[in-house]
Amino acid sequence: CGTTFEDKEWELECPRKDGAALIYANYAKRQFEVRNDLPGIYRYANWMPICRTLEGSGAPVTYKSEGLAAHLGLSNLYITFNGYWPERNAVMKTGSFKECEAFSVCARNNAFTDKIMVVASAGNTARAFGRVCSENHIPLLLCVPEDNLEAIWADGPWNDCVKLVCAASGCDYFDAIHLSNIICEMEFFYPEGGAKNVARRDGMGTTVLSAVEKIGRIPDYYFQAVGSGTGAIAAWEANKRFIADGRFGSHWMKLMVSQNAPF
């Protein structure tokens, strides 16, 4: 609808509430600039909707493939790694790219600092948000299927500001989402927002920022595994910003997404 507004109230949809589209961030810095003065993922702060930085983040790491490229017969294949691989300076301690989302979301301008954020997850997202909120003392309630509890691990005890509730054994991720929606109707809780949260998508989009920083241009093809597909939207939005920048190409990379059959 073309409505514009300042990001200050944890908006998850257009103020007109027409439900027609996702919020898209327009940043003051239209040209891509790496912030080498900031740690971890915040090197991409100019294209993240944040008002602060948090401790402990790691950025995606892009490198030119040798082994896989040779196996596939490719000469210009790059891999962007999100996880824990200290030898390549990848330090996401939960081993999940979801840390890109959590460190972005939790640094966003938030009108609900006196309330508790609610996140539904099947495992990876809970692990990442649990770590970030614990280390930065951000109140958090995680909703996870009981059968997925083995995916919730950490390299140390979580702070008491992080709590966990479970959908009973036999339930799945969608039941956890339903449980989180019920909780968010209560006075002292608010939803993180998932795909509707622009900070979630622009945190995911740092994977593309890392790739373009290393390669020097917009890729021709972009391969990524997806669950709900939010990561593909994030990649497309990052591509749009690079086209507007004008220094890295004017083309849309071909998004090649793979997905598990249950989705």
Question: For the regions a protein language model found, what residue spans apply to each?
Answer:
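PLP-dependent amino-acid enzyme catalytic core
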Residues: C1-F263
